From Swiss-Prot:
Plays an essential role in autophagy. Keywords: Autophagy, Cytoplasmic vesicle, Glycoprotein, Lysosome, Membrane, Signal, Transmembrane, Transmembrane helix. Its main location: membrane. The gene is TM9SF1. Coiled coil: none annotated. This is Transmembrane 9 superfamily member 1.
Amino acid sequence: MTVVGNPRSWSCRWLPILILLLGTGHGPGVEGVTHYKAGDPVILYVNKVGPYHNPQETYHYYQLPVCCPEKIRHKSLSLGEVLDGDRMAESLYEIRFRENVEKRILCHMQLSSAQVEQLRQAIEELYYFEFVVDDLPIRGFVGYMEESGFLPHSHKIGLWTHLDFHLEFRGDRIIFANVSVRDVKPHSLDGLRPDEFLGLTHAYSVRWSETSVERRSDRRHGDDGGFFPRTLEIHWLSIINSMVLVFLLVGFVAVILMRVLRNDLARYNLDEETTSAGSGDDFDQGDNGWKIIHTDVFRFPPYRGLLCAVLGVGAQFLALGTGIIVMALLGMFNVHRHGAINSAAILLYALTCCISGYVSSHFYRQIGGERWVWNIILTTSLFSVPFFLTWSVVNSVHWANGSTQALPATTILLLLTVWLLVGFPLTVIGGIFGKNNASPFDAPCRTKNIAREIPPQPWYKSTVIHMTVGGFLPFSAISVELYYIFATVWGREQYTLYGILFFVFAILLSVGACISIALTYFQLSGEDYRWWWRSVLSVGSTGLFIFLYSVFYYARRSNMSGAVQTVEFFGYSLLTGYVFFLMLGTISFFSSLKFIRYIYVNLKMD
């Protein structure tokens, strides 16, 4: 066979227009762009195939011994489609708009024993194919397997050789597409001797029906006996439970802490007025708690460059996550495919690099940092280096196994070009603005030259305990929704409840801010002024809980297996936990900083 129109050629039309990373076909707001007349040809593309329980382990459909044209012509793909592992190619199926086909022969094949064994292995691994009609995915199983555990034991494997396509239209647009094998018996692949050939006849039928649904987004893709139940009530119960947690934490911070602080401030200021003749050291001897460390609480932390880089990249991902959710709320993504989300994430990451540079450089200059160039390099490397290392391992495994998830060299070159020409320069530009607009750190209290000795702390005020409490509470607020997100990313479910996702994201940030303030207050009350890094680690540890949940999900909630899927799952789960660490660590730090400024600015000090 001859391959025409290699899918890698798509990059040639992308290089001159890097900013249009969302591509064509799956771009924002694109839905039903093709209009047909009765009898017009409708192209069906074959795409990819792979184990049902391993969605990221995909191979080209024509790698199986199936009907294919003499010359394989590939469809020009967008960036999002390539990132999603798509490799669309023209097929032998002839479909015309609104024309039914009872039964049409696709091709006749003579399969060798090796080819039959390849099909048997694919069916035993529950291979699941994907075709594409007018940007609508059509999915189904390659064959049928029946296992009997009773005596006599039987193990039957059959290949579906007749596919029944059902398409729904509205006016001149295709709204829905599906494939089934109803009333069709599979062709048995059992009992073939090594020197025998198996003759097969592949056929198909097409049924058209008109629908009252006007938009594809209104037609649930699972209405044809979908794989997943509708659990909207569970989502809302999760929201309610999380909101209760938020109200409890906000009430704890706003009522209990503020009342304690009000009493402490009143007593502190009263004692200062009655002992104005004494020295500050004498006063310190008669006081305790967070008030006594007012000369040390704003002492700059070690590794300030790394801290500022964490805050900068965390702020960038906060903007990136918010942008993705808002775009989803506006209906800018195709709910049936993830390619546009991948493209949007790359575009937003490149554009929001200016945020990381600005925040990092601005705060670094405020707290007295002098190595500005090193700070920018650290900021640009804090996420990109771990991501590149993880991607290199994952992509190498895909490439070694011939998976379509392995990115072509042209795609890699394009993404590197985007980072070098857009991401890195914007980080530097943001850093320059941040450095030039930074004013000296405005501390309400003067810092002594000699650091105060920190008394021994009880076990429940240790960093590990704070990380456990500060990570578990935000995680518990999103744990239910996290299952559905994992089932979408690492499974076959379709997630469309972006409004609920927005609420959950807001709840996550609110819980993180509240618990950070509470933990910081408890730390300061023990005369421990090393809150800078502690505030980042305490709530940032939510990322660790998310990674631990991913391990639980892999072991107990999924049927994923094999080196390809396992390496990708744990590699990107580690990155996901790292991103949440950066985001929530940033929220936690600035919440604690705002809280500390508030309580110390109200102290009367000379």
